[in-house]
Amino acid sequence: MAKLSPRDIKRKIQGIKNTQRITKAMKAVSAAKLNKAKAKLNATRPYSERLYDLINDLAMFVDRDIHPLLKIRDEHKVDIVVVTADRGLAGAFNSYVIKTTLGKVKELQEAGKDVNLILIGRKAVQFFKNKGFNIIAEYEDIYRDHMNLSFTSQVGGIIAERYENEKTDAVYLINNELITTATYETKVRKLFPIEPELDYTKLSEISRYNIEPSSEEVLEQLLKRYINFQLYRALVESSTAEHAARMIAMDNATRNAGEAIKRWTIIFNKARQEAITTELIDIINASNAIE
């Protein structure tokens, strides 16, 4: 590596400072978006959990053969809904989901099962497309304008149709979820079939109620909401975790830039000192030569 002049080093320091200003601004933007996203997430989680509890309770109470979405079959064909971000600059946020998905696909294929993917998020599409995976549907650029129940109803309709018509025997959902402001985890959740957790205390309580028009009709409506809202929650969870991951990544980048500035400033001072020393020696030598 060629030795840099003080001017080159100074230019390099200025470039790092410019980058630091950008990462600092991106951290501030991500922090603001994170606060807004957390408010939406805090409103989404309780409804999602209560909806699941209702379906779980009713599924214990009814004949599972009354609705195709409740039927449990041997798993020969499996669909995986993969949720990533559209953008990068968020550390290992997207790579965690992709790595987990690859592991799940390998596990299922080694068990002799056919695996199909539904991709949500540009990073998932970019990675899995044209690599030999069976892709049923792919969606990009959905977080800005399409992160709503209208979009999840569209995807949910595909999932429901495939399960009802036995095109798939199980559906898994893989996405990142926010744990704390500084941490997130990649979750693998089974959407279908719904396998209720038997609670005979609850079963006794439910049997006391008269459900109108009938438990079957109520359950059918809830199942539609369940698919759509679980997908919606996955998008909200992923979006919130993405903002947190990007905020952390930009904070780390800002700090790393600060450390780099310190190191290059020391190098600059040494180079300038060497240049001054060299000039002084040249002046002294010239003076001695004149004498």
Swiss-Prot record:
Q: Which Pfam families match?
A: ATP-synt
One MF term in GO for this entry? ATP binding
Q: Name one GO biological process term.
A: proton motive force-driven plasma membrane ATP synthesis
Q: Which UniProt key words apply to this protein?
A: ATP synthesis, Cell inner membrane, Cell membrane, CF(1), Hydrogen ion transport, Ion transport, Membrane, Transport
Task: Name the domain of life this protein comes from.
Answer: Bacteria
Looking up SUPFAM superfamilies in the UniProt record yields:
ATP synthase (F1-ATPase), gamma subunit
From the Swiss-Prot or TrEMBL record, state where the protein is found.
Cell inner membrane
| Annotated protein name in UniProt | ATP synthase gamma chain
Please give the InterPro entries that the UniProt record associates with this protein: ATP_synth_F1_ATPase_gsu (IPR035968), ATP_synth_F1_gsu (IPR000131)
The text of the family note is: Belongs to the ATPase gamma chain family.
Q: How does it assemble?
A: F-type ATPases have 2 components, CF(1) - the catalytic core - and CF(0) - the membrane proton channel. CF(1) has five subunits: alpha(3), beta(3), gamma(1), delta(1), epsilon(1). CF(0) has three main subunits: a, b and c.
Instruction: Describe its membrane topology.
Output: Peripheral membrane protein
Q: Which Gene3D superfamilies match?
A: 3.40.1380.10, ATP synthase, gamma subunit, helix hairpin domain
- Spell out the GO cellular component terms annotated for this protein, sorted alphabetically and separated by semicolons: plasma membrane; proton-transporting ATP synthase complex
Protein task: Produces ATP from ADP in the presence of a proton gradient across the membrane. The gamma chain is believed to be important in regulating ATPase activity and the flow of protons through the CF(0) complex.
